[in-house]
Amino acid sequence: MTIEKLAMNSVMAGCLPEYFPIVVTGMLAVLRTEFNIGGLATTTGGGAPGFIVSGRVADDLGVSGVTGCFGPGYRANSTIGWALRLAIRNLGGAHPGDMDKSTQTWPGKLAFCFAENEARNSVEPLRVAEGFSADTSTLTVHGLRGVHYNNETA
């Protein structure tokens, strides 16, 4: 993986240039050995990384943590998440049906990036809880699985 190839995936995802530092940070985070992106990206359970932006950078770039932040309408959320997903697939080889063995997956695997909603948060910000100063911006990555849906119409 090179910075140029990561930039190509960001452009394909529609990222604005100012989003790229978050994309780089996200990729460095998922490539950490202890995160185990290989296990998450290739499981049959449909797991995916979720990216939580905390601090001023979220406001500066328009990463949303308010109502509807997981859906369409927030370019930063969608394109940062999509750029990281493209890189995992295109550069890491996690192609559906090949290395990615998800039997069924979920929309969050396409793009799952959002901001911490500090204004509505009743506890200290995540970055502070993790030992960073309040004036620092951070990106936290969690391995997530999607919804479980049962439809009984009989």
Language-model segments: residues:
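Amphipathic alpha-helical packing elements
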Residues: M1-L40
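Short, conserved acidic/polar surface loops in the N-terminal third of protein domains
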Residues: E34-F35, G62-S64
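Long, hydrophobic, well-ordered secondary-structure blocks that form the structural core
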Residues: R32, A41-G45, G50-V53
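Short, structured secondary-structure boundary patches
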Residues: G39-T42, A119-R120
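A structural signal for small-residue-enriched, beta-sheet-centric alpha/beta enzyme cores
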Residues: A48, S54-V63, F70-G81, R85-A154
